[in-house]
Amino acid sequence: MISQFRRLYYFIFLSWTRVNGDDIKFTGNFMLASGLKISYISQDTSYLKGNLSEFAYNNKMDETLFKTILRKLDFNREQFDKNMEDFSAGQKKKVLIAKSLCESAHLYIWDEPLNYIDIFSRIQIEKMILEYCPTLLFVEHDDAFCNNICTKNINLCL
């Protein structure tokens, strides 16, 4: 196991961002241990197509577990056969959260996971995180959610 973490992959990030109309250049290094599995949720849900069974199959997920998590997130069974293109933004975000929770990963990275999510589902997501205790790095603006599940909180201000 130790030798696994001695082999690192390096990624260099160089990007630009705008803050108050000013371009800000930033760089950094990211080291990834060989064999490390990461589950990532992006803010973008526009690529979700087809129905949930197809999505589970294409992503090599346990369909029963996937749909069970979606039921905990207040999905009705009738939604299981609908096309994801017709889902609301909140329903699409729930699909990505359920997908991530179905994945066996060393690190879960979620970019604003609670965007468009209703209060009931926020509570359910919080309960699942507290129950399964994944190693989770996320960006979120909901202070109550962060305070309830975080073991360490880093505030970034630009």
Model-identified regions with their sequence ranges:
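ABC ATPase nucleotide-binding domain signature region
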Residues: 2-66, 90-95, 121-122, 140, 148-158
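ABC-family P-loop ATPase nucleotide-binding domains
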Residues: 42-99, 103-106, 112
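Walker B catalytic motif
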Residues: 83, 109-113, 117-120, 125
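Short, well-ordered alpha-helix to beta-strand connector turns
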Residues: 105, 133, 149-151
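A short, noncatalytic alpha-helical element within ATPase nucleotide-binding/catalytic domains
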Residues: 126-127, 133
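Conserved H-loop
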Residues: 134-139
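Conserved Rossmann-like nucleotide-cofactor binding loop
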Residues: 144
